[in-house]
């Protein structure tokens, strides 16, 4: 087995892994801060997070559908089409970001009522989700821009942006809650500011990268919309299924008690952290796989065999860790 395959997978995977893990890890910090305010507040975060996630995470195709297309275009040195794809992706970000903001902002009371929480939890959920809703467009911008950079083999930018978001979020969490006494409003606002600064960083990095594209590079006509959505359709269905499953579980928990909502909220993030371990390999390998497919050398290649072995090993590892240490992780 060619060790260079494992090296390429590692180089592309570790920034993505730590970036993906940081998001649920920071959400656990949000939950910790919320738990200091009270169980009802923590339950409110759980309900608000479910609504936000159901409407925003469905657009993960903006990331997963972008990376392989950018990678294949880069392999063909078709940077003119890469620029067109960036512009098209940003239009989608602005549209879906604005739409999501309006839906949550206008219909937040109705969306919260679907979980049938007690009055206090419903109020806390609204207090949390309204300021966080302003960060929707920044979050989607991060998804798209980081995906473009991964396709350009700049995966380290994904990790750097995640670190920026995590640090800003945690710092503002404690400042807004424990210094300015903003409560759940402060936690939601901290998240929005974190996404804003992270989006600014990625915008600057991508702008510098695009400035290196020369006018002499190849540029061919391709239907950007058709190519993008052909890659994104299956990913969109996967996202809808996963988000729907998690939202349904949270909805069932909300019908039992505030304690059940809080426990479900924590368990889902523990699950997310470990699943991200495997997902990071899938996300990072999109670049490598796309490059191989362009040259018609992926199927039955050492790379494909390496990816199958790595994912199988990680699946077994996650299963054993969760089976043995789940109670300790939750406590």
Report each predicted region and the residues it spans.
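Alpha-helical transmembrane segments of multi-pass membrane proteins
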Residues: 119-142, 270-274
């Amino acid at each position: 087995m060619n060790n260079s395959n494992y090296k390429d997978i590692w180089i592309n995977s570790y920034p993505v892994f730590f970036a993906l893990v940081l998001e649920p890890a920071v959400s656990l910090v949000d939950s910790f801060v919320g738990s200091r305010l009270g169980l009802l507040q923590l339950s409110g975060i759980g309900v608000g997070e479910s609504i936000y996630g159901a409407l925003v995470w469905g657009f993960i195709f903006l990331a997963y559908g972008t990376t392989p297309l950018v990678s294949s275009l880069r392999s063909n040195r078709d940077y003119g089409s890469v620029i067109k794809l960036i512009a098209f992706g940003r239009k989608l970000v602005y549209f879906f970001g604005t739409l999501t903001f309006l839906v949550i902002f206008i219909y937040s009371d109705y969306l919260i009522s679907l979980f049938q929480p007690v009055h206090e939890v419903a109020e806390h959920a609204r207090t949390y989700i309204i300021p966080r809703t302003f960060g929707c467009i920044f979050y989607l911008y991060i998804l798209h821009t980081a995906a473009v950079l991964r396709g350009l083999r700049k995966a380290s930018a994904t990790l750097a942006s995640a670190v920026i978001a995590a640090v800003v979020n945690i710092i503002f969490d404690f400042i807004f809650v424990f210094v300015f006494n903003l409560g759940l409003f402060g936690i939601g606002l901290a998240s929005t500011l974190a996404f804003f600064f992270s989006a600014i960083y990625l915008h600057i990095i991508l702008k510098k990268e695009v400035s290196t594209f020369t006018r002499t590079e190849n540029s061919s006509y391709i239907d950007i919309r058709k190519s993008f959505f052909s890659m994104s359709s299956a990913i969109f269905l996967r996202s809808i299924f996963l988000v729907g499953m998690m939202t349904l579980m949270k909805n069932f928990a909300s019908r039992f008690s505030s304690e059940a909502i809080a426990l479900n909220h924590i368990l889902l993030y523990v699950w997310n952290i470990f699943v991200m371990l495997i997902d990071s390999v899938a996300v990072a390998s999109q670049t490598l796989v796309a490059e191989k497919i362009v040259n018609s050398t992926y199927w039955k290649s050492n790379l494909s065999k390496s990816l199958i072995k790595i994912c199988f090993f990680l699946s077994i590892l996650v299963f054993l860790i969760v089976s043995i240490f789940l109670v300790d992780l939750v406590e």
